[in-house]
Amino acid sequence: MPFFLLDKLSVCDIPIPVVLMEGIYGNYSYLILSYIDGDDIGNVYCKLTDSEKKQIAREVVAIQQKVSGIDLRADKEWNWNVFIDTMLYRAEGRIKTYQYFDINKIATIKKLQCELQEYLDKVRPTPYLDDISTKNLLICDGKLSGIIDIDWIGMGDMLTFVALTRVALLNMDLDTKYIDYLLDEIHPNAVEYKAFVFYCLVYCVDFMGERGMQFLDKTIPVNKSIIKRLDDIFDVLMEEWNKCYE
């Protein structure tokens, strides 16, 4: 968790760790952070009531709105389309390598990208926390207690964190009422909602590409059930995309 990010976020009055000490030990720099009690929302999601999910969603969107106002400037070459292209390129390479899923799904999403190009071209480099999905968002006794593992701050469309969370919940075979509450707080218009569904599809193929991969000493599990579940999620999302045009 880089110090400069915590320093930037410290002005937002949001529940993040406090830097207690920093220093250098040998060739390594280190931070000692305050402890925040709680567990990842994905680990306790089944225990949350609808009212608790709604309150958490309200607080998360309020946090994102605060983060959007920090002074963080994008590189001159920043372009939101590069983010999308990079995600799809990575997923395509992985799916080709492991061959658990139909590579034509990438081509399908690229066609949707063209249909959404006018919207994507207008996305500005707005700061937001892009990795608070089913992890990194701590819950204690049904309440939001903190945000951890902030390795970077996203720049672009805040709807991506909602899309990532939705696909993660679907992949865990959990309900998505929390997503409904997040969207209720964000109030996306018709075009923004289409973009949200598009981002869900992008993250879906990203999840597909990870299946069977080796990360350090961990292999991402893959079997017929997992393959079917992700294929089904993709199909449901495509149906939703098509309904956006009805």
Language model segments and positions:
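Glycine-rich, phosphate-binding/catalytic loops in enzymes
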Residues: 49-50, 146, 163-165, 221-226
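Active-site activation/catalytic loop segments of kinase-like enzymes and analogous catalytic loops
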Residues: 159-191, 200-219, 229
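Short, flexible helix/strand-to-coil boundary loops that buttress conserved ligand/catalytic motifs
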Residues: 10, 20, 45, 141, ...
